[in-house]
Amino acid sequence: MSDPPFAVKGIDHIVLRVRALPRALVFYRDVLGCSVERQQPELGLTQLRAGRSLIDLVTLDGPLGRSPATPGPGGPNLDHFCLGLAPFREADLSAWLAAYGVEVIAPATRYGAEGEGRSFYIEDPDGNRIELKGARGDGPTQGREL
């Protein structure tokens, strides 16, 4: 079998359906530091820049949010997505998130696209789980978990 005629460069974008766009914008823009790149209110679409990727926020009452695609049995099919952060200073990040009322869940060392590094999970206002991850060497390494 030969190699495919392409190479995956990374995640281009993810699309999240949100109940309240203003609340989602506060979270992704103000808490996580993403910038608004493009808005198409007629579609219920706001696109946020997250490093080299985009996070598309789609309102449930807009044309895109009402699309016929539905989750499989038992609920949504997305477990979580991961945002790589630099620098990853765990205490500073935890304090920043706590100031916004965001709970840090299950801090540990995990493997990702750039190798092992410290990470933890948070949830956005719509319950989407997000992993925030540092590169190897950022933060403590105890509690190794893959």
Please annotate each region the language model reported.
Residues 60, 66-84:
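Helix-adjacent hinge/juxtasegments
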Residues 48-52, 122-125, 135:
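Active-site beta-strand termini and strand-to-loop segments that position acidic
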Residues 63, 112, 136-139:
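A short acidic/small-residue loop/turn micro-motif
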Residues 1-22, 78-81, 85, 136-146:
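N-terminal beta-strand motif that seeds the catalytic metal site of vicinal oxygen chelate
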Residues 12, 43-44, 79, 118:
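Residue-level marker for the onset of beta-strands and adjacent loop->beta junctions
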Residues 16-62:
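Core segments of cupin and vicinal oxygen chelate
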Residues 18-22, 76-77, 81-126:
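Vicinal oxygen chelate
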